[in-house]
Amino acid sequence: MATLRSLLLAALLWVPAEALSCYGDSGQPVDWFVVYKLPAHSGSRDTPKGLTYKYMDQNSDGWQDGVGYINSSEGAVGRSLQPLYRKNSSQLAFLLYNDQPPKSSSARDSTGHGHTKGVLLLDQEGGFWLVHSVPRFPPPASSGAYTWPPNAQTFGQTLLCVSLPFTQFARIGKQLTYTYPLVYDHKLEGFFAQKLPDLETVIKNQHVLHEPWNSSVILTSQAGATFQSFAKFGKFGDDLYSGWLAEALGTNLQVQFWQNSPGILPSNCSGAYQVLDVTQTGFPGPSRLTFSATEDHSKWCVAPQGPWACVGDMNRNKAETHRGGGTVCTQLPSFWKAFQSLVKDWKPCIEGS
């Protein structure tokens, strides 16, 4: 009887584990979200400089003000990454990669690897892919806590999180053999290493060895939304956007990227589709918040007439034509509308380009 009573009590006290997925600003699981960390100058006087952000997910109907600040573990990014820093993470697998890894990690900056930043966090049911533009982020699992790096406060940044079934991570693994990320922290053991051999390859600093030097795959989210990943290896030898993406999507593109680096590629109208460098971004609403591309480290692009929009980790400059990297695109109407509304100005093509 005592044993039965104990079992009943245990059943009453048992709480099922939270599903591993992206978590939104609402504190609830979401299929996907985008966080746009705003440049430091854009905050009001009574808010911390460089920590405010805009947010959207499948339920938000466009951009909203972020809940709290980007350095909070209660917001979408911090809450989604919490499982990484918990002590009971034995049933998880993860990869943290960044061409500019956190200074607390043993990895060094590397131009030999791809210009690519992201997080894979999963269990045997599924998890999420966080594609972002943030240097020195996130902290390694051993740090024990989510933090936002001080170096990433000044400029704008983008983070796209997509919740995915386990089956999709083999496809992501294939893509990472093209982008050739610098992995600075990982855990891929037993079941995960067996089922995801391409991720094991990536952890061992290996990459694709033969043509083609680019790859695209369809990814289906936990809720059935369709995303398309585009990945290129350094030997592709061309700009991601004008050399491949515009033609692959069959559309003109307006591209936001970091324009303070050397060798910036000008707007390109030499092909069937125009690829135009965005120079000014602005959010809708009474504040009329606008900022220059020189204040914005984010990487995204949008088809001016629809239906595509993409968030990734590559710039348009000469050096990155010879580095791996990629972007994740979708035709979700709300996603496209949100990014299309941001473009306020761009550089026209000069004659002959």
Swiss-Prot record:
Enzyme Commission no: 3.1.22.1
Report the record's disulfide bonds.
22-161, 269-349, 310-329
Taxon lineage: Eukaryota, Metazoa, Chordata, Craniata, Vertebrata
Q: Does the keyword rRNA-binding apply?
A: no
Q: Name one Pfam family in it.
A: DNase_II
Q: Identify the tissues in which this protein is expressed.
A: Highly expressed in fetal liver macrophages.
Q: What is its main location?
A: other
According to its UniProt entry, the function of this protein is described as: Hydrolyzes DNA under acidic conditions with a preference for double-stranded DNA. Plays a major role in the clearance of nucleic acids generated through apoptosis, hence preventing autoinflammation. Necessary for proper fetal development and for definitive erythropoiesis in fetal liver and bone marrow, where it degrades nuclear DNA expelled from erythroid precursor cells.
Family matches, as PANTHER family: DEOXYRIBONUCLEASE II, DEOXYRIBONUCLEASE-2-ALPHA
UniProt protein name: Deoxyribonuclease-2-alpha
Q: Which residues cross the membrane?
A: none
A Gene Ontology cellular-component term? lysosome
The superkingdom of the source organism is: Eukaryota
The disorder on record is:
Absence of Dnase2 is a cause of severe fetal anemia and of perinatal lethality due to malformation of the diaphragm.
Listed A to Z, the keywords are: Apoptosis, Developmental protein, Disulfide bond, Endonuclease, Glycoprotein, Hydrolase, Lysosome, Nuclease, Signal
**Active-site feature positions:** 297
Recorded hits in InterPro entries, A to Z, give:
DNase_II
Where does this protein come from, organism-wise? Mus musculus
The entry annotates sugar attachment on 71, 88, 214, 268
The similarity comment for this entry is:
Belongs to the DNase II family.
- Enzymatic reactions: Endonucleolytic cleavage to nucleoside 3'-phosphates and 3'-phosphooligonucleotide end-products
As for subcellular location, the record says:
Lysosome
Reply yes or no: does the keyword Hydrolase apply. yes
Annotated GO MF terms: deoxyribonuclease II activity
